[in-house]
Amino acid sequence: MADEERDAGLSAADDETDASDDTDQRSSDGDADDADDASSSSDGPVYGRVTPRDETVTHGSDDDASADVAAETGDNGDDSDSDTDAAPDDADDSATDSDADSDDEPRLLADDEHTSHVPEGTYDDSSDESADDVDPDAAADGASPALTGEDEMGGVAPSSVSAEDADFDDEDVGGLVGEAPESDQEMPLTAHIEEMIRRLAVVLGVAGAITLVLFPGADILNALVDTQAAFGVHIPSATDVINFLWNSHIPGAETIVDRRPRLYGPLELILTKLKVAGLAGTVIGLPVFVYETYLFMRPGLYPKERKYYLAAVPTSLVLALVGVLFAHFVVLPAIFAYFTSYTEGTAVVAFGLKETFNLILILMGYMAVVFQIPLFVELAIMMNLVTRRWLEDRRLLFWGAFLGLAFLVSPDPTGMAPIIIGATMITLFEGTLAALRWTGN
């Protein structure tokens, strides 16, 4: 219908403009156009393009009507040809899509299609040959073929492991990894508590016995029996310890009557004797406490941990004893000499027993802890927590920390004791670093 309307419009326009043209000429032109359309249809359809016809159709002639019918028939033939040509194209598109879908689906590769990602020059055929040469009888017996360094994962050959690493045992790990030592046995919680109470009872028994011997046992025994004449040795009592410390630290205490200890309460002497006797019992019983603690933990310790424990604890006790002696011979005499020097001109020196012994015992205990600095530094370096160079680079920070602790914890508000203690801590720290540098650690 669209072709008929288009033909009608074209014929009307041609009638107005070309009315004088010859009818035969128009028919010959129509035949030429039909021949051109036939040739264009034989060449192939042109999609998306409409080619106008130049022929003019009239209604007054049968020849013209037959020409129009022939033209319409040719147009319909062209349309059918174009539809016929489009069908194979659609078939080709569907075939292409099906091929693309089939390429996306996984499929098994043939033997000749397998490729290797190993770079050239890195693959050794000798490994395949050695694998082919494996004795099947040896494989059946469970023996594995010897592996070379190249066959090992990561390229590490077993022969490259040092003898020290080969002798390494899980027990030497130190409890950080691996299983528990063989001596560790499962025990119920009540059994652990009973063992702990039993070992603590031993420690308390030893410390209590020493305390009772010093006070009041020694005083009673010395009053009843002349121990010097009977046993050849004088048993020291708490009173003897108090007199020794007082005469050693207070300047002129033996010659100046006013510098004898003053009592400002009815229980000061008794409490001071108990304090001194208890401190002596604790100090003497401390090795027993360390030994019982080691026996309690020994089943769960690795050999390396036992070695560290047995090396560190006696060293700590020795350092604590050195700190107490340093306080007794250096720190306390200097402090009390300073106290008496600036009070002699204005007042009578009369120290109370309780406050004086509190200061003495606190400073002795403080110096016992301060002298653990070399042990702490050594253990930190041995455990790879820090290095000597790291400590040396931050020495000013440690100096400030030492002085801050000395001024905060010291019982002396005048600043004399904190300065001595801070200088001692810095000296111990620097001396430890110097010793490590000298030994090459």
Curated annotation (Swiss-Prot):
The chain crosses the membrane at residues 200-220, 276-296, 317-337, 357-377, 395-415, 416-436. The keyword Plastid does not apply. Keywords: Cell membrane, Membrane, Protein transport, Translocation, Transmembrane, Transmembrane helix, Transport. Forms a complex with TatA. H.volcanii possesses two TatC translocases: TatCo and TatCt. Both paralogs are structurally atypical and may represent adaptation to the extensive utilization of the Tat pathway in haloarchaea. Part of the twin-arginine translocation (Tat) system that transports large folded proteins containing a characteristic twin-arginine motif in their signal peptide across membranes. Pfam families: TatC (PF00902). InterPro entries: TatC. HAMAP family: TatC. Residues 13-22, 75-104, 122-138, 164-173 have a biased composition (Acidic residues). It is a multi-pass membrane protein. Belongs to the TatC family. The keyword RNA-binding does not apply. PANTHER family: SEC-INDEPENDENT PROTEIN TRANSLOCASE PROTEIN TATC, SEC-INDEPENDENT PROTEIN TRANSLOCASE PROTEIN TATC, CHLOROPLASTIC-RELATED. This is Sec-independent protein translocase protein TatCo. GO terms for molecular function: proton motive force dependent protein transmembrane transporter activity. It is found in: Cell membrane. Residues 1-185 are annotated as: Disordered.
